[in-house]
């Protein structure tokens, strides 16, 4: 029997720096097999150094991470798909109790950040509950397949708008404990692991959504026709009259356009072009047995997930040469109801 040594070469006959470049070319869909080659390979594939080598050689891959909820609503877990639609397994659940009204974003291209939300606490009355907002923030690093707790927000909040702009994470408005409406915002700097409170226009809106465009933060409040635009360079807000009021419950951004599901437009997918300040919509195929509930993005295409577990996912093809159209996405088949999805590069 050959005993492995920690100093054994990654590939016999090659220096480790050359061998690392070779191994970094292996697609992640093959990691389960290649990690069984030897202990040295397994250790290298799971290391932060391996992730750095892949980034250096430009061999990072894009993965769709889907947060799902079981039918009973008690179990929440993540499933991961690669660019070909291969299901690569699950990532560990977010620490702490199950939350609603949370935010999920991606920083540094490959780290998932889960922040805020609320839990329900039983009240003293019959069938009564109170809402407890959370300021907790957790970060998932795919290099070591684990979560770690980051600095918490200054104010616990849920049902807020959020977006990443130039590497910084912004959360806007929302609600705190006892459904107290918030009229401020916060910004997180991952380099310093600090949150800073910031002013934002006070609008009586219900959640809404936010996105980045031209290095600026766009905040759209449900029930308001005004869009608040924040310029990080000048640290100032400006107001844009979009001339349309929305009630958005799910959205995604593809090719600098915002696609959204609006309670006021059943059977339609809304489209907002921030460059033209124009609104439009496209037909959404009806779904027997339930409503479309969440949007996502994969391979530069809009994904439409069903509320009902086991039903297929639809994909909206934005390729103008082929003509935009809906078709069934056979590759992406989540095993439960989708709550959120993000893309990471790793």
Curated annotation (Swiss-Prot):
Which Pfam families does the record match to this protein? F-box, Kelch_FKB95
Q: Where are the Kelch repeats?
A: 62-109, 111-167, 168-215, 217-257, 259-300
Q: Which InterPro entries match?
A: F-box-like_dom_sf, F-box_dom, Kelch-typ_b-propeller, Kelch_1
Write down the Gene3D superfamilies for this protein, in alphabetical order.
Kelch-type beta propeller
Q: Which UniProt keywords apply?
A: Kelch repeat, Repeat
Where does the record place the F-box domain?
A: 9-56
Q: Which CDD domains match?
A: F-box_AtAFR-like (cd22152)
Carries keyword Transport? no
In Swiss-Prot or TrEMBL terms, this protein is called Putative F-box/kelch-repeat protein At1g27420
Q: Which organism is it from?
A: Arabidopsis thaliana (Mouse-ear cress)
